[in-house]
């Protein structure tokens, strides 16, 4: 009887020690599937704690704030790369034409290069072209100033007082330079009329816009020479017939072999 009581007490003591015992996973030999049953839910309690939640929210806000400038910089860099790519493609498209222009006419090529970097050229192409034309006439005016200062001063005074000079300075300078080279052109007209017409074409734009005004101007310029030289007078008659004679337009050489027609009309 006493042995039964002692054995029951021993069993009760074993059960009590088993329920109150703490299991250490590192030193336990139990399977890993049994260990979580005896561990407290530390992880879930930690994530549900307000301090941990506030810390996580702060970290998320800081990460988003730091990522926004990085995203903006990435977008700006992508936009810059896109613009550079488009500019490179356009430059590659124009490179053959620019290379050909540089070989044929280096001055025009340099003017095209300066036009892209000139604010005046981008804002007002007409004003830029007039400025370039004025620069083309500067060497001739400088030579005139060195050879004949009085004539140069007269040109400057006429340039500031003439309505044509104020409205269109390049055209005015072309007319003035044309008047200066009239003697040489007159000799060329007597010797070779075809070459004379070819020389007149790039200098005077008035013939294309208003042929009547051009003829009047030529008469005013060359009438004194025509009085002194009958050959010049005959040539002027032929020149006046030129815009109205289809045959002379087709063959200027043969038209100058008919001075009787010009003398009969005029």
UniProtKB/Swiss-Prot annotation:
Keywords: Seed storage protein, Signal, Storage protein
Role description: Zeins are major seed storage proteins.
Record family assignment: Belongs to the zein family.
Source organism (scientific name): Zea mays
Signal sequence segment: 1-21
Gene Ontology molecular functions: nutrient reservoir activity
PANTHER family per UniProt: 22 KDA ALPHA-ZEIN 8, ZEIN-ALPHA A20-RELATED
Gene: AZS22-14
Cysteine pairs bridged by disulfides in the record: none
Additional record remark: The alpha zeins of 19 kDa and 22 kDa account for 70% of the total zein fraction. They are encoded by a large multigene family.
Superkingdom of origin: Eukaryota
Keyword Signal: yes
Protein name: 22 kDa alpha-zein 14
Record carries keyword Signal: yes
